[in-house]
């Protein structure tokens, strides 16, 4: 089929005042129904397509009367004239060839092939005309080998062959420059006229976007607040953990200080206890020494004196007294060990002075009896051991002094006996 003959036939149809069917144009519609190839522009065969569509609907109603049975409650009933005018208005608003052109041509060439009732036929036609995508005529693309088509729709990959044209029709905007709400903003650019329903949909979509944006902002704000609260909680947790750690360290330091103080107190007690033991040992040793000194004095007396009953008794009495006085009690040991060195020295000096005073008295009084001498000797010998626990270093010297004193006293006593 040649394009020139088709264009001439369409021009002749438009020039006629009375619209009639044309066999050449009907053959063109049958060719499109079989192949889906439109060789001319939409504006060139639009008028004949509208004429043929209206004629087919009228013929279908005339040949097929309306349904006499009860209407389907699930389907809205629309009168024939109203449905016909709606379909014609939609098709008249196209700016390009709809991508369902092949199916529409099938319905125009063979209307009773799939439909028996007028209502169902009109609904089928309405479903195929309510589209927004458009296609280009096939003859324009014969020179290109990279055309990708599916059901008459071009894909963006074909734009390289036609850089000066849009993908979905001459009246549609380019995909790169298309706004987010292109369908709701201007529906007529894609082949359908503007309507109140499209405007309502546009307003609803804009309200949804505003609500979504406000919700996202609220979520972001709440997320920021939550993150801030989390940071505050982390900071407070860290502070409490640090405070607990410092408190634990302080308690450990206090325990260590207490342990050190206890150790120092134990050492001080040990140091205080150590000096007492040598004192007691010295006191014990000194208590042993006087006994030996008294024994020496008793032996010296026995050797120097002559045998007499009075002297032996005196010596025995003196020895008994000295032994009784030489046995120091625990209280004496304790006092001697606890007395200071200065006090011990003072006591020793006093005892020495008293001993010297007794010696001078004995030498000056030759008339004194032997019994008195012996008693004095016993007293002096008893006094010397009592002072001996205070110092262990002077004990031997004191023992020698007492021995000399007793020897002198024994000589004076012998002289007195001879004189009597």
From Swiss-Prot:
Function text: Regulatory subunit of serine/threonine-protein phosphatase 4 (PP4C).
Family membership noted in the UniProt record: Belongs to the PPP4R2 family.
Protein species of origin: Danio rerio
Region named Disordered: 157-420
Classification lineage: Eukaryota, Metazoa, Chordata, Craniata, Vertebrata
Complex formation: Serine/threonine-protein phosphatase 4 (PP4) occurs in different assemblies of the catalytic and one or more regulatory subunits.
Name of the gene this protein is made from: ppp4r2a
Any one Gene Ontology molecular-function term assigned to this protein's record: protein phosphatase regulator activity
Residue stretches of biased makeup (Low complexity): 212-224, 368-394
Biased composition (Basic and acidic residues): 196-210, 229-250, 267-276, 318-332
This protein's name: Serine/threonine-protein phosphatase 4 regulatory subunit 2-A
Biased composition range(s): Acidic residues: 251-266, 346-364, 411-420
Biased composition (Polar residues): 182-195, 278-296
GO cellular component, one term: cytoplasm
InterPro entries per UniProt: PPP4R2
